[in-house]
Amino acid sequence: MKINHLDAFSDNYIWTMESEGKIAIVDPGDAKPVHEYIKKTGYVLTDVLITHHHWDHTGGLEEVIAEYGCSAYGPSGGHIKGVTNPLQDNENFHILDYYEFRAFSAPGHTNDQLSYFCDMTEKPILFSGDTLFYAGCGRLFEGTPGDMLFSMDRYKELPPSTLVYCGHEYTESNLKFAMAVEPHNQDILQSMKQVQEARSINKPSLPSKIDTEFKINPF
């Protein structure tokens, strides 16, 4: 599986998973970059993963479903239009006709937030939506600090080598906060240098890794 990103809005990422001419995407807040990428590559869109209900993660979902007739996995409850396969906490499902993912509840940013984990790739991967960021965590729109702590504890249980793909490019601002909290943390300083180099050539700072988050994330 190959993972790429599509830019959306000012700082959103729509993640793509590509294998043998097929593609799955995560959080299509805007349908336009999805259409353009599929037209360019000729891939067949088979699956969509939705992490939570916010418009910048779901805004293009109905248009994408109507255009490609693909499956859409997301939080249960019927509140996200376009989700064809609602998921419960710790429910497994398959995408791209092969890869098994586990959806698990990760509340805090929203109450319905799901994260998606797969260990069938070269390194384990996690799509964390807006709960876990590189060097940070999501703003509490609906959940409580206790909810966020619950979610952080769940992430701690994942393999340290897990690659973390979150929903936004917030890394530099997160690292600035982390530096203020731990000004002598050399791992934070090194991460900032690497991130600034990547952003200077318009490359994503992501993915992060779970073991990196243990070293630099103040949350």
Residue ranges and their predicted role:
Residues 136-162:
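Active-site-adjacent loop/tail segments of enzyme domains
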Residues 15-18, 92-121, 125, 157:
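Core dinuclear metal-dependent hydrolase active-site scaffold
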Residues 1-43, 116-129:
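Conserved beta-strand hairpin/beta-sheet module of binuclear metal-dependent hydrolase folds
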Residues 153-163, 172-219:
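Accessory terminal helices/loops
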Residues 17, 27, 52, 64, ...:
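Divalent metal-coordination and catalytic microenvironments
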Residues 28-30, 53, 77-78, 109-110, ...:
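Active-site metal-binding loops of divalent metal-dependent hydrolases
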Residues 23, 30-105, 124, 194:
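Active-site HxH/HxHxD metal-binding segment of metal-dependent hydrolases
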